[in-house]
Structure formats: C-alpha cells, structure tokens
C-alpha cells in the first residue's frame, strides 16, 4: 500500500513537470513558460504555497487539485499517475484564463 507521502511526492513531481512544460501566452502575445505565480493565481493560492508544495512541505486541497487538473486538461487521477506521459506533454495556455 502506498503511503500518503509517496502519493504527495508523485503529485508534486507531476505538477512541477506539467507547470514547467506549459507555456502561457500573455495579452500582448509574448509566450513564456508557466511560473509558480501563474499557477498560484489560477488555483487561488500564493507563490510560496506552490513552491512549498513542489518541495514536498505543503499539501494541496481537493479543490486546488481539481482546478489544476482542469487547467492542464487532464482527469484528476492522471495527476497522481506514476506513468504520466512526460515525453510528449507540451501545452500553451492563453493568460486570460486567469481572469
């Protein structure tokens, strides 16, 4: 049986991977990779919380996990998948989703 810690570590690893491989198109057309700030704004959190979660010192709420899955266009259970198809994932999101 998996421990809570191993599940949280997998979620943190997958989230970080998805975030750093997602591009955000800003209003003036500039495209850059998603920052912790972008992600925090979308899920209603703070940059420090995202940083702590990616480091494994904080946990996300169920509603935050749901919003993250929706943002990346994945079913919630895929965020916990140890076989997330990491070699093929790239996505560009328009910044206006944060408003």
PLM features: residue spans?
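A short, Lys/Arg-rich alpha-helix, primarily the initiator
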Residues: 1-32
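Short, charged recognition helix plus adjacent turn
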Residues: 1-6, 70, 80-99
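Residue-level recognition of specific faces of alpha-helices
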Residues: 14, 49-52, 59, 78
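Residues within the helices of the helix-turn-helix
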Residues: 16, 37, 66
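Residue-level detection of the helix-turn-helix DNA-binding "recognition helix"
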Residues: 20, 44, 55-57, 66, ...
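Short alpha-helical DNA-recognition segment
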Residues: 25-52
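Helix-turn-helix/winged-helix DNA-binding modules
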Residues: 31, 42, 57-60, 71
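DNA major-groove recognition helix of helix-turn-helix/homeodomain DNA-binding modules
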Residues: 61-78
